[in-house]
Amino acid sequence: MNRRHVLGLAGAGLLAPHVVRAQGFPDRPIRLIVPWPPGGSTDTIARLFQPRLAEVLGRPIVIDNRGGASGATGAIEAARAPSDGSTWMFVYDTQATNETVMRLPFRTMEAFVPVSLAASGPLVMVAHQSTPFTNFQQVVDAARRAPDTLNFATSGVGGLAHVSTTLLQQQGNFRIVHVPYRGGGPAVQDAVAGHVPLFMTNVVIVSQHIRNGVLRPLGVTTRAETRHV
């Protein structure tokens, strides 16, 4: 292969083994870079796919978490790896947006070969149980009364959660303060602890906390309700 392989977050790529076998494949473990810390949605889903990928590819899969800079740190590491098929990356939406918000030493579509879409799901805005909010309109009303006083967490700058919440603010004429984290894992920890009142994220990492009543769903980015919240 002349480019690194990317497995996108949003069924494991059954075409991948045929592609790599046709071009020769290293007889050693595959390094699967997850450009986020452990505990977030990308890491969680990558670990769900890990056994199946190892079975299909016929090689051990070693997950390497390289969090930082909204996924850019891990992506740079992956781009610098030998283009021999031994390094793959499991990505999230920021791989599509990072080039627009920061300077990278590569062009994403030139440095990587997309393999497969792995999972998809809606974003959800949640509030800690200690807040008075039970729906998103209440957040809008509070933010209009006192702009820039409510904080909301995301997994990092430039991700879909950040971009979509910024768009909501522009369209809804209200302002809340973005608190970017170094991944969904650290962000959900602070959201559950009540250190940040609002958290915009995907459903995967908060569904259990919603069921337990620690986090309260205020709205989802779908036209219809989702069974996960």
Where are the predicted features?
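Beta->alpha turn/N-cap motifs
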Residues: F90-Q95, G184, T201-V206, T221-R223
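C-terminal lobe and pocket-closing loops
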Residues: S120, T134, I205-V229
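Alpha-to-beta junction loops
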Residues: A81-M89, P147-T149, V192-L198, V214-R216
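Extracytoplasmic "Venus flytrap"
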Residues: L32-I45, A69, T154-L160
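Short helix-initiation/N-cap motifs at beta->coil->alpha
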Residues: R66-G74, G121, V179-Q189, N202-I205
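Hinge/capping helix and adjacent helix->loop/strand transition within the periplasmic-binding protein
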Residues: R80-S86, T100-P186
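Short, polar/charged alpha-helical segment
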Residues: T42-L57, H162-Q169, H209
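N-terminal twin-arginine translocation
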Residues: M1-F25
